[in-house]
A protein has these predicted regions:
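Extended, low-polarity transmembrane helix blocks
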Residues: 1-42, 60-68, 72, 78-146
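Membrane-interface interhelical connector segments
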Residues: 42-58
């Protein structure tokens, strides 16, 4: 029993690093979302046309909304500013991307399925619930200066 208590105490020491997983999620999502938004700028007409074929009204406007949401949200998530607020429109984009684009292809990402949209949604939901984390997030420093 003493061994289990000692192991528990050792594992409890990892609480000092509780900020790290949230920071790593933010870094990863920045990379994915930033380049998704930037690539849509480079292929604006192609993406807008694709949205039009899906029946999305005003595809040019929605293309800009997606670009701003992905690139702007990625930048805010990277620096840890308004992380919870940024997660909400990004979750909406992920929902519609998953439903309109990926759902009919099933789960596997190899078939352009919903797998990555679901994983990114879970990561964004984590940020929505827990925020950007301690120390490496501007939200933390802004809220601690009250």
């Amino acid at each position: 029993m003493k061994i289990l208590i000692r192991l528990h105490d050792i594992l409890k020491g990892f609480e000092a690093f509780e900020f790290l997983p949230l920071f790593l999620i933010r870094l990863y999502l920045f990379y994915v979302l930033w380049f998704a938004g930037i690539n849509k700028i480079e292929s604006f007409n192609k993406f807008s046309g694709y949205l039009g074929t899906l029946g999305v009204p005003f595809p040019d406007i929605f293309t800009w909304l997606v670009i701003i949401t992905e690139a702007g949200g990625a930048a805010l998530i990277l620096i840890g500013l308004f992380v919870r607020w940024s997660s909400i429109p990004l979750l909406v984009v992920m929902f519609f991307a998953g439903y309109l684009v990926h759902w009919q292809n099933g789960w596997p990402h190899e078939a352009n399925g919903i797998e990555f949209a679901a994983i990114y949604s879970l990561m964004l939901l984590t940020l929505l619930c827990f925020g950007g984390g301690k120390y490496l997030s501007l939200d933390y420093w802004v809220s601690s200066n009250k």
